[in-house]
């Protein structure tokens, strides 16, 4: 704590490897965390591979800061830290205070890990660790255990000051959201699409979301589920726009006039065409889906080829080769799984045929699609879309548009 503030130190991730764009990525990381914490007036700086965060020394501010750091893409780890002058006396004094606190909490053994980033400092990393460790050991506060210590005290001598910290929490890694453009996620209520969105967020892409419903055949609870999924994604991406489009009239037309085995695939073709219009309106440069090869009948190689041919935009499928158990594990980690398994059907499952087409030809499906004269219905669906802006939960409320 310095001058009534609490300090945090975070290790940045891949952006430290991006030589030419490094400063751009650092600025984006600073901006993202500042936006997450704008309700508590933070001070954020990224330099030399570290992110420095200072927030007011209140319980509410610290809780908000730690929630934000837990959702911040672009860092590999973070910790609450103590800053002190770059002298051995100050470093030793602060380290001894950390050891004394650990002893009061019932810890018995310790190890020092020191890193001298500023090579001008008067001691090497090993000398810092040895000298500070000797003082703590001789004081009787804790005993040395280099292999299985109860507590590790980290010391970093940086270019302006030194930092000491104990427990280090794992970061999400990846790239800062916003450095890789904008994409439109086709967000259903299932397990896969939120994970696909998170995967693209972790590669630095800002995502907006598109949800298709078929009210009254799909209940309002199904849309509420998707809204809750979008809120979770907004925690990692700062914000998202959720566009909701009704497919009710289109599905009625397909149910009446389309060949039964082609129903799901024709519906997917309609979705892709509408999605392209929404994406261009929102300046998204790609579409994102949660499709995984051969996971269900509509995701055979041939079916994916047909839907890809319906848009001029690239379709990113980050889960295309993923195992279902791995997808579920990620969904659980990011907080979407419990929402996704709520028992409400989406529009794709309502009228799914018993024996869907598995090996369609692109030309044949395009002929079927064109014969249905769906253009006016697609235009109506796009025209009656509804949008909601959703923000991450860092003291900012969501607002409708």
Curated annotation (Swiss-Prot):
It catalyses: [ThiI sulfur-carrier protein]-S-sulfanyl-L-cysteine + a uridine in tRNA + 2 reduced [2Fe-2S]-[ferredoxin] + ATP + H(+) = [ThiI sulfur-carrier protein]-L-cysteine + a 4-thiouridine in tRNA + 2 oxidized [2Fe-2S]-[ferredoxin] + AMP + diphosphate; [ThiS sulfur-carrier protein]-C-terminal Gly-Gly-AMP + S-sulfanyl-L-cysteinyl-[cysteine desulfurase] + AH2 = [ThiS sulfur-carrier protein]-C-terminal-Gly-aminoethanethioate + L-cysteinyl-[cysteine desulfurase] + A + AMP + 2 H(+). Pathway: Cofactor biosynthesis; thiamine diphosphate biosynthesis. Belongs to the ThiI family. ATP binds at residues 186-187, 211-212, 268, 290, 299. Its EC number is 2.8.1.4. InterPro entries: Rossmann-like_a/b/a_fold, ThiI_AANH, ThiI_fer, ThiI_N, THUMP_dom, THUMP_ThiI, tRNA_STrfase, tRNA_sulfurtransferase_ThiI. This is Probable tRNA sulfurtransferase. Keywords: ATP-binding, Cytoplasm, Nucleotide-binding, RNA-binding, Thiamine biosynthesis, Transferase, tRNA-binding. One of its GO terms (molecular function) is tRNA binding.
